[in-house]
From Swiss-Prot:
Active site: 150 (proton donor), 163 (proton acceptor), 167 (proton donor/acceptor)
Family assignment from sequence similarity: Belongs to the short-chain dehydrogenases/reductases (SDR) family.
The keyword DNA-binding appears for this protein: no
Protein name: (21S)-21-acetoxyl-apo-melianone synthase SDR
Chain's role: Oxidoreductase involved in the biosynthesis of limonoids triterpene natural products such as azadirachtin, an antifeedant widely used as bioinsecticide, and possessing many medicinal applications including anti-tumoral, anti-malarial, anti-rheumatic, antibacterial, anti-inflammatory, anti-pyretic and diuretic effects. Catalyzes the oxidation of 21-O-acetyl-isomeliandiol to (21S)-21-acetoxyl-apo-melianone.
Domain of life where this protein originates: Eukaryota
Tissues showing expression: Mainly expressed in petioles.
Keywords (A to Z) from UniProt: Oxidoreductase
GO molecular function, one term: oxidoreductase activity
């Protein structure tokens, strides 16, 4: 006989403890609020101390801030251990923190230092977060590890070579960890966004102009991807409704990555 249970509306993470890296701004800050609204105790991890602490103070009880440079393993160890000491467990590790290229350029114009910076945060930082989350989840035989990747892992040209390789590493890590950690009841997934206007991506440009350009280029008309679209996708993967979902790259791009522009152009010419 099938059994079905549902958490109270708006409380899909009731009783859960979550760490969200890069949680002081952008996608991370929205995820912090949505996870908190859904009943989770949330630890914000970031290097933007004023923003992170201000968000924790705004949301109040059940939300705290810990400074953490995710490319520094000692910082990550402290983040996880402090969370477990405070709340007694860690249910969800959302490795969301990331950086983009200073200049969106070709491989010919990309210095080695830019590649190393992207790999250090986007790939190695996520690796370290997953490593130390798994360290405390394995004895409990359960847990959820999430990442933010990118739709550039699905279609060429959405990101620079350096950024793309750093995010491909995340998707590869998701698949590898899902295979390794499944025996311990730990699920591992990622969310891959299409372009969206955040403080990091706009870099002083009017967000409305960025959104207009992305909407014009995008496949799904009449909709604009915002941070809550990604945070809600992460919420689904984090909650018990996704209890048998692991090893997946949930691409949130309005169908952009499955579109063949050559075919669409030919179709328009014919008609």
């Amino acid at each position: 006989m099938n059994s079905y249970s549902s958490a109270a509306p708006g409380k899909r993470l009731e009783g859960k403890v979550a760490i969200i890296t890069g949680g002081a701004s952008g996608i991370g800050a929205t995820a912090v609020q949505i996870f908190h609204d859904n009943g989770a105790k949330v630890v914000i991890s970031d290097v933007q101390d004023k923003l992170g602490q201000a968000l924790a103070d705004k949301l109040g009880e059940g939300v705290s801030y810990i400074h953490c440079d995710i490319s520094n393993e000692n910082d990550v160890i402290n983040l996880v251990d402090t969370t477990v000491a405070k709340y007694g467990k860690l249910d969800i590790m959302y490795n969301n923190a990331g950086v983009i290229d200073r200049n969106f350029g070709s491989i010919l114009d990309t210095p080695k230092s830019d590649l190393e910076r992207l790999l250090s945060v986007n790939t190695i930082g996520g690796f370290l977060g997953a490593k130390h989350a798994a360290r405390v989840m394995v004895p409990k035989q359960k847990g959820c590890i999430l990442f933010t990747a990118s739709a550039c892992t699905e279609i060429a040209g959405l990101g620079s070579p350096a950024y793309t390789v750093s995010k491909y590493g995340v998707v590869a890590l998701v698949k590898s960890l899902a295979a390794e950690l499944g025996q311990y009841g730990i699920r591992v997934n990622c969310v891959s966004p299409y372009g969206l206007a955040t403080g990091m991506s706009t870099a002083g440009v009017d967000p409305a102009l960025i959104e207009s350009s992305l909407s014009e280029m995008g496949n799904l008309k009449g909709q604009v991807l915002k941070t809550d679209g990604i945070a809600n996708a992460a919420l689904y993967l984090a909650c018990d409704e996704a209890s048998y979902v692991s090893g997946q790259n949930l691409v949130v791009d309005g169908g952009f990555s499955i579109l063949n522009p050559t075919i669409m152009k030919a179709y328009n010419l014919i008609n």
